[in-house]
C-alpha cells in the first residue's frame, strides 16, 4: 500500500474514533444505564479533582507530585454516590413532576435547588470525611465553616445549569451533562477541603 493511502486510512480511522466512542457509550447507556453513569461520574469526578490540584499547584508554584489519594476519593465518590444516586433522582423527578404538569419547569428547579442540592452537598462533605479517615468532629467543623458558603456557591453556579439540564436535556444524558459541569464544581469543592 502506498504511504499516502495508508496515511489517509489512519486519518479516516482517527476521525471516526469519536463516532465509535459515542456509539459505544450510547450502547452501554442503553443496556447498563446505572453502571455507565456511575463510571462516567467517577472518571469525571476524579478529573475535577485533578483540575483542582493542577490549579492549586500552579498558583502556589508547588513542585510536589499530585495527591493520588484525592483522585481516588473523588473517583469513589462519583462511582458509588453521584452516578447511581443522580440516575435515580432524575428518574424520580421525571416521575414525580412530569413535563405536562403546570409549572413543571419551575417545580423541578425548586425541588432540585431546595432539596437535592443541600442533600447532595451534605452527602459530599460526609462521604469525603469518611474517605479521608477523619472523625465526626472534623465533619461537624467542616459543615459549620464550609456548608453554607458552598451551598450559596452551588445555587449561584448550578441553578441555570440545572434549569437547562432537568428541563431540556434528554433524561438519559442528564447525569453526563451534570458531570461535565461538575468538573469545575469539584475543583471548587476540592479547594474548600484544603
Curated annotation (Swiss-Prot):
Alphabetic keyword roster: Membrane, Peroxisome, Transmembrane, Transmembrane helix
Q: Does the keyword Cell inner membrane apply?
A: no
**Topological domains, Cytoplasmic:** 2-30, 96-113
Topology versus the membrane: Multi-pass membrane protein
GO CC, any one term? peroxisomal membrane
Q: Does the keyword Membrane apply?
A: yes
A Pfam cross-reference name: Mpv17_PMP22
Peroxisomal topological segments: 52-74, 135-172
**Transmembrane segments in this chain: where?**
31-51, 75-95, 114-134, 173-193
Localisation: Peroxisome membrane
Return the PANTHER family for the record. PEROXISOMAL MEMBRANE PROTEIN 2, PEROXISOMAL MEMBRANE PROTEIN 2, PXMP2 MPV17
Stated family: Belongs to the peroxisomal membrane protein PXMP2/4 family.
* Quaternary structure (record): Interacts with PEX19 and SIVA1.
What this protein is reported to do is described as: Seems to be involved in pore-forming activity and may contribute to the unspecific permeability of the peroxisomal membrane.
Question: Under which name does UniProt file this protein?
Answer: Peroxisomal membrane protein 2
Task: Name the gene behind this protein.
Answer: Pxmp2
